[in-house]
Amino acid sequence: MTTEFETRSDEPRLNATEIRILGSLIEKQATSPETYPLTLNALVLACNQKTSREPVMNLTQGQVGQSLRALESRGFAKLVMGSRADRWEHKVDKALELVPAQLILTGLMFLRGPQTVNELLTRSGRMHEFEDAEQVVHQLERLIARELAVLIPRQAGQREDRYTHALGDPADIEAIIAARQNPSDRGAASGVSVERIEELEARIAALEERLARLEE
């Protein structure tokens, strides 16, 4: 048995920048296959999106480039040489032996940290079709069994348990949990439903993707 935030001793830990890079590559592969693999510039924009990212980051090309080379050396990313520009793709599914459903859930947890089953079900809609929440739970349990994800018991004021990946620094995971605002509070404070917030975030993300393609 592992403690709440332990990861497998034989799995390499990923830092916050590497986690954001891999999450962004997984997302864009699913939502923008016509522009995937991504150029370095497009990947930086994807990493620094202000929607569908928790927390929002402000990474430089140098930081992303250095992290990509580290990820490549460990089998998590690959450089694809092109006639116009070099591009990058992830190898998370190969490195961790994940099926498509597990890859999408892992990518979402990379991008947004701890989430409820319903949040994962809603946010995965553009990337993978789960029939219901039970399918999400099934895949999460398979990840937990391999010590690639962890269940976070609901905190005071929360209605549901949350799940997150187990490939980062446990201290970082603890910090994210402590700082993360309860999504239900977001909606209650503004008078807007969580579903409406998710819809607006998806629209903004689509516009940011179009901008990234225009700037390539």
From Swiss-Prot:
It comes from the Bacteria. Transmembrane segments: none annotated. Signal peptide: none annotated. InterPro entries: DUF480, WH-like_DNA-bd_sf, WH_DNA-bd_sf. Belongs to the UPF0502 family. PANTHER family: UPF0502 PROTEIN YCEH. This is UPF0502 protein Pfl01_3711. It comes from Pseudomonas fluorescens (strain Pf0-1).
